[in-house]
Every structure is written in C-alpha cells, then in structure tokens.
Amino acid sequence: MAGVCDRVPNFLSPSEDQALGPALGSAVALNCTAWVFSRPQCPQPSVQWLKDGLALGNGSHFSLHQDFWVSDNFSEIVSSVLVFNLTKAEDYGTFTCSAWNVSSHSFTLWRAGPAGHVAAVLASLLVLVVLLLVALLYVKCRLNVLLWYQDTYGEVEMNDGKLYDAYVSYSDRPEDRKFVNFILKPQLERRRGYKLFLEDRDLLPRAEPSADLLVNLSRCRRLIVVLSDAFLRRPWCSQSFREGLCRLLELTRRPIFITFEGQRREPIHPALRLLRQHRHLVTLLLWKPGSVTPSSDFWKELQLALPRKVQYRPVEGDPQTRLQDDKDPMLIVRGRAAQGRAMESELDPDPEGDLGVRGPVFGEPPTPLHESKVSIGEGHASEMDVSDLGSRNYSARTDFYCLVSEDDV
C-alpha cells in the first residue's frame, strides 16, 4: 500500500515553474494547487513552502491558507496560498511548493526595475512633432489654402452694377501718392487684375464732396483706406473717427485699413485703437518693409479681403470675321468697276452689312460671270500689307466693323 500512497501528485497550479516581477511594496499571493491520490490508509496530504531552500511557516510576514477537496476515485485536491508583502529586497527569491516532498513547482520572484517610460516618452515626442508640423504647415500654407478656396468656391461678385473692385482713399502727401501709384496700384491692377478707383484720378466733375463720395463708394465693391501718419493727422480722424467708421460700415462691406509698422509705437493713435477693438467688422492689414515682395503675406491677405477674380478665356476669332475666312473686312477695298463689283461679291458675301445679302434689283442687268477670279493686285493695286491677318486678335472688336473704300485709302 505504500506504493499506492507514493504516487506523484499532479500540479494544477502552477502547471510549470513561473517567474514573476512584482514591484517593491506590493502584496503577493502565490497559489499552489495539486491533485493527489489518496486512500484511507494514506497520510493526510500537505503542501510545504520553501524560500531559497528554507522552509516557511505562518508568521508575521508570511501567511498560509490551506484547503482540501475530496473527489471520487480516491483522489483529493489540496490547495495552499502563500500571502506576503514585498517590503524589502530580501523578500525576493525562489518560492517552492512541494506535495508530500515528492513533487514540487516553484515561483521565482525577481525585482522589477523602474517602470519603463521609453515608449510613452517616444509617443509623446512623436505627437509633439506632428503637432509642430501641423502648426508650421498652418502658418506657412494657411493663406495659400484660403486663396485656393476663394478662387475655386468663393462668391463671384459680378453683375452687381459695380464698376470698380476697390475704392482707394489716401492723403495727398507725396509719400502716400508714391505708395499708392508705384506699389499698391501696379500690384493690384497689373499683376492681379483688379480695377481700382483712386481718389485723385476718377472723381466726377462738378460734384459735391458728400454726394461724390456716396456715388464713388456705390460704384466700388470694397473700400481701401491707407492710414498713413498724414492721413491720421486729418481733423476728422482725431475728433470724429468713431462716427466716420460707423458711417463707412453702413456704406461699404467690411472696409480695409492699411496701417504701417512705425505706427505701433506708443502712444497709439485713438483711431488705430478703435480699429483694433472692431477687428470683427473691418480688415486691418499691417505694411512691413518686407511686404513689398509680391509673394508676401500682405498681398495674400489683401487679396482675400478683395472680391474673387474670375479669369475668362479669350474667344478665338471674331464672329464678324468667321464668314470672311478670318480676313479683316476693314481692309477690304471696294472697287467701282464691274470687275470690282464682282470682286466685292466674291470677297464679301454680305456687302450690305448686317441686313443680309442684297438680291437683284428689278430692271438691273445681271452681273456677268467671269471665268477667272480677279485678284486685288491685278485691277486695283493696294499698298496694304495683309500678310499678318491670320495672326491678328479680333477679340476686342466685337461691336461693329466698317468697310474701307478705295477713296479712303
């Protein structure tokens, strides 16, 4: 019977040796459960704990809880739980549980180092780099993206009865005239295709100042005010600028004010302070020494504040010259002879203009037919050079045309 009682237990937990790395100061519970073969004549099964080869028992530092469950077929399950706190480095080691001193499994506790924050630090740095790149792209490409959106999906302000894109108001000082005529106007009109109304150029004759201002503003889609030092020295800028600003907001849509970098010094002009307080109602732009570059942010912000420009593709050919085989009817010489009349009917199928082809007149002899075509150089010599007619652009002349006679030549 002794051989029956010496059968090797089967460990259910742990199924194999384990290595654990709990942190210092944590509580540890090691569970050792085994299935043993038992007979009435066999001794009571038990589980023994050892630490680094030394036996452990219940004490102030270690606590043991042992349970038994009897099953069929003369088998029994025994479980022992070792509970303790890792308070010092000596508490780490190899803990072995054995059943009947026949079979054993072990728990190896090793001290885990400080929590690894490398992955968290790398992830944080990656997120920070991504945010910096997004912020950099926003700063560098924000205006370009807004311009693309305006040119693609922006509101087209056409057929509104306006003749100009912007009304430019500035003082009559020489430096302001130079800024408007040599910097602002060339950049907006020539490079970007806007049409400006300058205060000293297209004024209505013999008009009252107040009525003239109302008429001019009604003809323009935007208002640009060059707030130079000379402009700010005007009496109304210091005394009644608030009333004037309220009036402008009623007359025009979101006026544009151009300020200069030298005006940022203290004390700030009351008009500039008022404009900064109402940024949500006006467009306030700052001119810097580097703004003269065509690709600077100043021009992009100004273009965003101005109406969207629509580019039209030029029409190829003039409807009035398509019937003439792309020949300019203004250069066709009309003759007086019969041959000239025949030449006229051949070169111009519509000699009476837009009224249609003239039919035969009652009583008029029919026009003789000629076997050979008469060229211009045979009957009536012309000194005009018509070799470049095919390369001319007729898109600008779409309203009317006239025929040039030989006498006019």
UniProtKB/Swiss-Prot annotation:
It is found in: Membrane. Keywords: Disulfide bond, Glycoprotein, Immunoglobulin domain, Membrane, Phosphoprotein, Signal-anchor, Transmembrane, Transmembrane helix. The modification Phosphoserine is found at S382. InterPro entries: Ig-like_dom, Ig-like_dom_sf, Ig-like_fold, IL-1_rcpt_fam, TIR_dom, Toll_tir_struct_dom_sf. Disulfide bonds join C32-C97. The chain crosses the membrane at residues 119-139. Residues 162-306 form the TIR domain. Glycans are attached at N31, N58, N73, N85, N101. It holds the Pfam family Ig_2. One of its GO terms (biological process) is negative regulation of interleukin-1-mediated signaling pathway. Residues 9-109 form the Ig-like C2-type domain. Acts as a negative regulator of the Toll-like and IL-1R receptor signaling pathways. Attenuates the recruitment of receptor-proximal signaling components to the TLR4 receptor, probably through an TIR-TIR domain interaction with TLR4. Through its extracellular domain interferes with the heterodimerization of Il1R1 and IL1RAP. This is Single Ig IL-1-related receptor. The gene is Sigirr.
